[in-house]
Amino acid sequence: MELRVERVEKNYERRLAVRYHDETAGRIYVVYGGCIFSMRTVGRDMSITMFGYRLRSPVMCALVSTELLQNRRGRGEAAAEPSVGGAGSPGADYLFTHHLGSASGEAPEDLVNTFDVNVRGLVLSKLFVGFPVPDGIVLRLGEVDEGTGVLRILAKPRAVNSVTGFVYHLDSASLDLTQAELYEVPQFLAKDIEDLLRMGELRRSPLRLSIPRTPVIVTGNRGLSTITVPSSRGRGGDRRRRRRNVTKMAGHVQIKMFRDERDGQQTETDAGRAEEEARHISGWSGGDHCRVEPCEVSHLRVWKVVSLIEVALAVRKGPLSWLGLAHKNPTDNLRAVLKGEARDVCEKLGPWTEIMGKSVLRPGPEMIYATVNYLLELGGLQSKFCIMEDLCNKYAAKHNIDVPNEAPPSDEMALIEELAVSILQKAAVVCEVLRFAAKAESENIAAVRNVVAPKQYGAASELLVHETSFLLNSARGGAFLGPEDDGRAATTRPLFKRAMARTDKKVSAILACIYLESRPSRIVGTILGGEDLVRALEEARLRIVDPWDKDDISAALRVLDSIVNFRLA
């Protein structure tokens, strides 16, 4: 995992505080014990996102928890509630590498701004490298590239003898790269939290223009687990947040997966295994895995994923799962999150509803979600397609599925294109209706306010009112303006909340009509009363011919992106 930042330094309480700032995202990053803590510098959201390796071995977790508890008792402190950032005694599900450092006797000051964690103890070292190491080992979990301004958590952490420098083979099953959502300030940040946030206001030298601004990137061939750390607040705390056990990926990052070719110090065994795996995984293209290729390869990518996504996202349970004893596959949590997102987005009324009922392909929510994510990737928008593609490649390799690498079957590809065209055409019509409604509010509000929608769409429209309000607010802000609007500003006419709610309800019925009808242009034009609108809607629909043409589908993609973001919020 890596992200581009700018180093910020400040003397604080007789020590040098080093933080990393992403001005574009409005976030400050702190490195602590091999983990990266991310905080917002603007807005009211005070939640903290942490990226790092979580301990997976039950024996290891028990040993670390015991050491943390003994350390606290030795200092005369009471046992603490779960605390990811502090030196307390967290639950076994919330132990990270910085807890490992605390258990080995490291002070918080020694863990700040370092990706190296000392592991002391024969049993712990054996759990990591397979045999006891009397000298102790150092886990090298990441690095800071000062030349390019990149913080990087290594896809393959290294275990190094703390005396001789000998590099051991690290058991990859002992650690799990995880995103944790925290709702309490970690103890090591609590002392300088105000000063930390002020660091975002410091005057910095301009960022080098040659360095492209990129989101957080996850590298390697394993997924990113997500958890929510329960609050330690007692009665009166936020129970809703304590109940959450599935966390979505952070909204300020985009996850992309590709093989990490920077880790050149891996052992010969690791290199051989990686080469063997690369030969088996079809369609793997190294660091360019998430780059959109020419048309034929693009067709092949989406065909592979749509063909395999349902089985690839199936969470497999062991024979003893009914007893609660089965060991979960490390990627099962990722599969569950993606499967849940597919259902949250695509099982509801949307641009895909009609095609799901009539297509020969019989697409399920997973197929629809994969297709939508691929379209979003084509448009350069935030997408989960690369994660899905990685899971499908692994599934094909594991089950010896022969996937062609040249051209997909033409009949199957035609069905996928039909699916993509249908979704985009519906989204294009929705875009025109939203633009029409936003414009009417500022010029001729009766054009929307006085329409009478057919009663058969009433029940369906009730489910879309809040989503329609979100889409209309985006349209009022100019999100869906096209080139023909000639730079027209967003709606400036003051609108009362009750009046806007009436418009939202009317438009939600129109959107339900678009989603349910095969040829909605004529019906919607009749409802809104205008042949010019019928013509505009039909032109927008028929403009979508090639679903892989980024220029033709740009307006429809903005609508799809807004729908997905609302339903996953």
From Swiss-Prot:
Gene Ontology annotations for the cellular component aspect, listed alphabetically: host cell cytoplasm; host cell nucleus; viral tegument
Superkingdom, taxonomy of origin: Viruses
Source organism (scientific name): Psittacid herpesvirus 1 (isolate Amazon parrot/-/97-0001/1997) (PsHV-1)
Function: May facilitate the viral transport through neural circuits.
Disulfide bonds: none
Keyword Nucleus included in the entry's annotation: no
Protein name (record): Tegument protein UL21
Region (Disordered): 261-280
Protein family membership: Belongs to the alphaherpesvirinae HHV-1 UL21 protein family.
Designated gene of the protein: UL21
Record keywords: Host cytoplasm, Host nucleus, Virion, Virion tegument
InterPro entries, A to Z: Herpes_UL21
Pfam families for the chain: Herpes_UL21 (PF03252)
